[in-house]
């Protein structure tokens, strides 16, 4: 999408975000910008509001009445034409230790994704704060983690040739990851330990990274032995700010790089009001601004060259100022977020993928190997039998009343009856999928159940211990940090979670998701469905609708099928018709 003409931008906002075609800012040349244009899109935001949903011609083909599977092949072909695989990791500016760890411990990842290429180059070369919008499973978190670990080993290399500079840990926490939940923090921990297995000693890991929790032991460890990379969650950091914990001054005064994962949950842009009704846990509205102000207050502006060089981070992060270099990553970032961040980042702000919001190869449709289904479940009167039927597809035109309904969540009248219907539906689909996997020579390993926020996953697992399907028993397990397993060898497990617990997670053993539809938020569905299809993997997501127990007054006045199809349409999804080959359906 093209930027708006410069004439409609006021001077104050225009200087905040550099236009990629311009080479001067306030009369000063920025020659380093020419070196970054290939991997980071630095452009001006569009200052408009209330834009309707835009569907280009490639998107519209998926909604035409005469749409066929041949159209899928065309979409896939054009996707590959526009966004091929990124370069191999050894072609990117990563430290050799990181490349060795990738080839040894992540052998399944041969090539980077186009988005990883942009993130790694921007972090390692430009030193510019930037905001990223990329499809789910595009490797945003993994690419950022590789870059920060590479910075650590570059610091060690510097110290080897400059022993007078001192140890890296003496300068405190240099990089801070902020994530929405403990599960995503555990995933970062798993990635780091797996990547560095056989490369660093186990004792050295505590100097490289630590997870900040609210326990006294964790706070003391951060205070006295700060790591190079800190990882914490929105709630934990928010609690530290409210309680004015002494540790805040310790690491904000040394912080050089701040990476906010799933940043749309903390940026109070205009889309936040729409997400307030979604099942995700949002951070406090002033959380981000409070933390940035804290960094401004505590960060040492006049850092001597020995300390900065000793960490080796100044060579990567050119921008030395009153706030650290900041990176914001999410599949739901928008230009409103760019406008908000421009209040604090007043020199240069890069954007990656923001202009591609409505491009079909930059969203959920970028993973054509993931199939979406919409199934209505109903209990027959006076019996316990459940009937499953496909909801027929139709193109839904834009309608303001449906738009408002689509942004409101709804709940159920009888949660116990709803769970009984849902618990009967899941094993029946599993039975069909197990038969198909044998015929197609695919292994059906693990699945995930996503319940509305009013349902408790622990209660579900206690009530339904598991599902017997054929000669296999699928054990129900909550998605807690104690039970998380990022191995690809896990089998016969049903992970049960709420939407707020799965943000950003990549569990490679999961191939199917069973989602009990409870919200019309396109943002929420995008992140639920995004748990599949990472790095080109295949998968299926089954959306179950149980309309007999909806209690929303708005929903009773409106065709629920059209509302749900409208929300799927907003994220570029056309559900397929599922083939029920079981006679009981």
UniProtKB/Swiss-Prot annotation:
Domain Helicase C-terminal residue range list: 390-584
Entry's Gene Ontology cellular component terms: mitochondrion; nucleolus
MF terms (GO), sorted A to Z: ATP binding; ATP hydrolysis activity; nucleic acid binding; RNA helicase activity; translation regulator activity
Sequence motif Q motif, location on chain: 87-117
Phenotype of gene-disrupted mutants: Decreases the association of cox1, but not cob1, mRNA with the mitochondrial small ribosomal subunit. Decreases protein level of mitochondrial translation factor mtf2. Strongly decreases the protein level of several mtDNA-encoded products, including cox1 and cox2. Impairs growth on the respiratory carbon source glycerol.
InterPro entries associated with the record: DEAD/DEAH_box_helicase_dom, Helicase_ATP-bd, P-loop_NTPase
SMART domains: DEXDc
Keyword ATP-binding: yes
Subcellular location(s) of the protein: Mitochondrion
Effect of residue 230 to E: Strongly decreases cox1 and cox2 protein level
UniProt catalytic activity: ATP + H2O = ADP + phosphate + H(+)
The protein's Enzyme Commission number: 3.6.4.13
Keyword Transcription regulation included in the entry's annotation: no
Effect annotated for changing residue 261 to A: Abolishes its assembly into the MRH5C complex and impairs interaction with the mitochondrial small ribosomal subunit, and the interaction between cox1 and the mitochondrial small ribosomal subunit
Keywords: Activator, ATP-binding, Helicase, Hydrolase, Mitochondrion, Nucleotide-binding, Translation regulation
Binding annotation for ATP: 134-141
Positions of the Helicase ATP-binding domain: 121-351
Positions in coiled-coil regions: none
Gene Ontology annotations of biological process type: mitochondrial translation; mitochondrial translational initiation
Residues spanned by motif DEAD box: 261-264
Family named by the database record: Belongs to the DEAD box helicase family.
Function summary: Translation activation factor that as part of the MRH5C complex specifically recruits cox1 mRNA to the mitochondrial ribosome for translation initiation.
Subunit structure: Component of the MRH5C complex, composed of mrh5, ppr4, mtf2, and sls1. Proteins mtf2 and sls1 form a subcomplex that serves as a scaffold to bring mrh5 and ppr4 together. The MRH5C complex associates with the small subunit of the mitochondrial ribosome.
Protein name as it appears in the record: Mitochondrial translation ATP-dependent RNA helicase mrh5
Organism whose genome encodes this protein: Schizosaccharomyces pombe (strain 972 / ATCC 24843) (Fission yeast)
């Amino acid at each position: 999408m093209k930027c708006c003409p410069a004439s409609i931008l006021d001077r104050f906002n225009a200087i905040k975000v550099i236009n990629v075609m311009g080479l001067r800012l306030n009369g000063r040349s920025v020659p380093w910008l020419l070196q970054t244009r290939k991997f980071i899109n630095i452009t001006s935001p569009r200052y408009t509001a209330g834009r309707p949903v835009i569907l280009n011609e490639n998107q519209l083909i998926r909604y035409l009445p005469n749409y066929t599977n041949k159209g899928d092949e065309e979409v896939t072909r054009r996707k590959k034409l526009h966004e091929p695989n990124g370069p191999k990791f050894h072609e990117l500016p990563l430290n050799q230790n990181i490349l060795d760890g990738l080839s040894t411990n992540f052998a399944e990842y041969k090539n980077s994704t186009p988005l990883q290429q942009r993130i790694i180059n921007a972090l390692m070369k430009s030193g510019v704060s930037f905001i990223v919008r990329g499809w789910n499973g595009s490797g945003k978190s993994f690419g950022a983690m590789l870059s920060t670990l590479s910075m650590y080993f570059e610091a060690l290399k510097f110290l080897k040739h400059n022993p007078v500079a001192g140890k890296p840990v003496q300068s405190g926490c240099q990089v801070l990851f902020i994530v929405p939940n403990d599960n995503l923090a555990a995933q970062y921990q798993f990635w780091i330990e797996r990547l560095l297995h056989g490369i660093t000693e186990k004792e050295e890991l505590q100097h490289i990274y630590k997870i900040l929790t609210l326990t006294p032991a964790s706070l003391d460890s951060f205070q006295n032995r700060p790591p190079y990379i800190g990882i914490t969650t929105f709630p934990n950091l928010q609690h530290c700010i409210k309680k004015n914990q002494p540790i805040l001054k310790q690491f904000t005064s040394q912080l050089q790089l701040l990476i906010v994962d799933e940043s749309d949950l903390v940026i109070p842009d205009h889309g936040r009001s729409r997400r307030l009704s979604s099942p995700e846990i949002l951070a406090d509205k002033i959380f981000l601004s409070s933390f940035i102000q804290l960094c401004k207050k505590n960060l040492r502006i006049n850092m001597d060259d020995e300390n900065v060089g000793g960490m080796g981070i100044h060579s990567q992060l050119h921008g030395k100022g009153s706030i650290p270099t900041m990176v914001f990553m999410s599949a739901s970032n928008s230009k409103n977020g760019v406008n908000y961040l421009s209040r604090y980042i007043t020199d240069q702000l890069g954007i990656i993928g923001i202009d591609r919001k409505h491009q079909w190869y930059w969203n959920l449709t970028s993973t054509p190997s993931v199939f979406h289904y919409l199934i209505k479940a109903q209990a027959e009167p006076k019996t316990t039998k459940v009937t499953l039927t496909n909801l027929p597809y139709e193109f839904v035109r834009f309608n303001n009343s449906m738009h408002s309904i689509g942004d409101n969540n709804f709940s159920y009248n009888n949660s116990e009856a709803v769970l009984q219907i849902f618990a009967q539906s899941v094993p029946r689909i599993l039975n069909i999928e197990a038969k198909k996997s044998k015929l197609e020579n695919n292994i059906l390993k693990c699945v995930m159940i996503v319940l509305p926020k009013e349902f408790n996953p622990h209660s579900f697992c206690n009530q339904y211990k598991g599902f017997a399907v054929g000669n296999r028993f699928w054990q129900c397990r909550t998605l807690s940090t104690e039970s998380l397993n990022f191995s690809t060898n896990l089998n016969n497990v049903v992970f049960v979670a709420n939407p707020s617990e799965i943000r950003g997670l990549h569990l490679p053993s999961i191939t199917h998701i069973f989602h009990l539809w409870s919200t019309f938020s396109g943002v929420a569905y995008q992140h639920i469905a995004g748990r599949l299809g990472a790095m080109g993997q295949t998968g299926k997501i089954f959306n179950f609708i149980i309309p007999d127990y909806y209690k929303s007054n708005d929903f009773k006045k409106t065709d629920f099928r059209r509302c749900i199809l409208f929300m799927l349409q907003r994220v570029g999804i056309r559900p397929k018709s599922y083939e029920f080959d079981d006679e009981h359906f």
